[in-house]
């Protein structure tokens, strides 16, 4: 199996809930164990942007997402924001990588300054201190100088800043194609196989030169 086997996926309150849900589905399809964290703001955004209504309690949410993604029992583990005994809170038991998708600029700021006010922020802090892959997927426009400074700081610390900015060279035909573009880039960054998006040049079979 290439890429990390255990991944923390956090969703925060930026627009773009579809990205997080699609990424979760893809990770399940690739037989990864996912530790799922979600902020209250992200739950509100998800209810606004999708037809997915997550239960409030972690145990009920875990059962819902397991059925929603067709996951095996125990493949998706959901932890509350104040569950400080959860594996992502400790460097000795945290998953091999973490993705925050979508990542709000508030969460971006908290991670950049080392704040650990909730489990999402603590899990990101653990990923940084343990030098494990950390991918942040901000969805904001325009970016302020503060946002850009926080991104630069995190990039210098080893995190990957992967904005939710779809490309168009694959000629997308639907919103789902645009979502898949970003999710495919996340999977590529983690080293996890994906067949949603051809790599540049793969479909270029004939040259005029």
Curated annotation (Swiss-Prot):
- Keyword Kinase part of the UniProt annotation: no
Query: Catalyzes what?
Result: dimethylallyl phosphate + FMNH2 = prenylated FMNH2 + phosphate
The residues that the entry says bind FMN are 13-15, 39, 104-107, 116, 139
Q: Which UniProt keywords are given for this protein, alphabetically ordered?
A: Flavoprotein, FMN, Prenyltransferase, Transferase
GO-annotated molecular function: carboxy-lyase activity; flavin prenyltransferase activity; prenyltransferase activity
What family is this?
Answer: Belongs to the UbiX/PAD1 family.
What name appears for this protein in its UniProt entry? Flavin prenyltransferase UbiX
Gene encoding it? Answer: ubiX
